[in-house]
């Protein structure tokens, strides 16, 4: 194919570079965590050919709607290899994902009510989205005047604890994880250091016993003078370790999107 013959606008996918990026991120995670996964953010670029490649490379699919959930299944992702986030879930796919072992992070009060539709004879796990006020936990990395996120439950005003208590009333449902995604202005290492510390503060304050922490996305890619995948992972690892978390017993989920593909296109 001659590049000069292509009509614009168009995107060109460098498959080799995409593979290289994924493998580099996985090597970084392998160097620190025995249990981890990369949940690629489908909304970043949902080209089926590329999604199939990412599935073959062992990535999970991070989806935020029933249409993305359906697309992930269509291109071959197993249901247990899906991370289901966001307030746009529908009831049918929400319950289907939980029943089949997906990582489902609750974002809304209605989703908690939907848990009552699960078969009481089986046990299930869910996560919950924490509403991050980046202006408070990492002000140097936030936009001016930035406050609470639009998503999840606030720890400061008691919403998070109330939501967790309601989940725990469902005797066959266990809270398995926390989701703490917030894209920052700087995409710095400091953001992830502060997010991890904030997560541990919540865990200790509420006495939670979790299976995973999902630290979200918002990373730089292979860009000059920017943190590398390894530096991000090392920061997450050291921050959890410093706060007394046994990282051998907890899965770490990352949700890169643009950082994997922006120089593959």
Descriptions of predicted regions:
Residues 1-118, 122-124, 161, 165-174, ...:
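A charged N-terminal "starter" segment
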Residues 9, 99-105, 145-155, 184-190:
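Flexible, glycine/proline-enriched loop segments at strand-loop-helix junctions
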Residues 64-67, 85-88, 125-141, 173-180, ...:
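Non-cysteine beta-strand/loop elements that form the S-adenosyl-L-methionine
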Residues 148-169, 191-199:
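Metal-dependent enolase-superfamily TIM-barrel catalytic cores that perform enediolate-based chemistry
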Residues 182-183, 213-223, 256-258:
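Glycine-rich beta-strand-to-loop/alpha-helix junction loops that act as flexible
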Residues 186-194, 222-233, 264:
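Short glycine/threonine-rich loop-to-helix capping motif typified by GTGT followed
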Residues 235-244:
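Alpha-helix-loop-beta-strand connector modules within alpha/beta enzyme cores
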Residues 258-265:
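Residue-level detector of conserved catalytic or cofactor/ligand-binding positions
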């Amino acid at each position: 194919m001659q590049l000069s013959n292509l009509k614009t606008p168009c995107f060109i996918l460098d498959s080799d570079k995409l593979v290289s990026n994924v493998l580099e991120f996985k090597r970084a995670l392998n160097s620190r965590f025995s249990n981890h996964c990369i949940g690629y953010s489908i909304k970043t670029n949902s080209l089926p050919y590329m999604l199939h490649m990412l599935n073959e490379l062992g990535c999970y699919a991070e989806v935020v709607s029933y249409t993305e959930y359906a697309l992930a299944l269509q291109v071959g992702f197993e249901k247990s290899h899906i991370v289901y986030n966001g307030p746009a879930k529908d009831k049918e796919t929400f319950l289907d994902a939980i029943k089949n072992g997906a990582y489902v992070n609750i974002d809304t009060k209605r989703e908690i009510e939907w848990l009552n539709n699960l078969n009481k004879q089986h046990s299930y796990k869910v996560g919950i989205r924490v509403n991050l006020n980046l202006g408070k936990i990492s002000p140097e990395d936030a936009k001016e005047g930035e406050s609470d996120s639009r998503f999840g439950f606030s720890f400061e005003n008691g919403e998070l604890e109330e939501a967790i208590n309601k989940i725990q009333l469902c005797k066959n449902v266990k809270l398995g994880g926390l989701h703490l995604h917030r894209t920052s202005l700087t995409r710095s290492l400091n953001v992830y250091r502060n997010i991890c510390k904030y997560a541990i503060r919540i865990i200790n304050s509420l006495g939670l016993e979790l299976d995973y922490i999902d630290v979200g996305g918002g990373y730089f890619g292979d860009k000059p003078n920017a943190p590398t995948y390894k530096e991000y992972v090392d920061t997450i690892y050291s921050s959890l370790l410093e706060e007394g978390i046994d990282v051998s017993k907890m899965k770490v989920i990352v949700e890169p999107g643009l950082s994997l593909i922006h120089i593959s296109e």
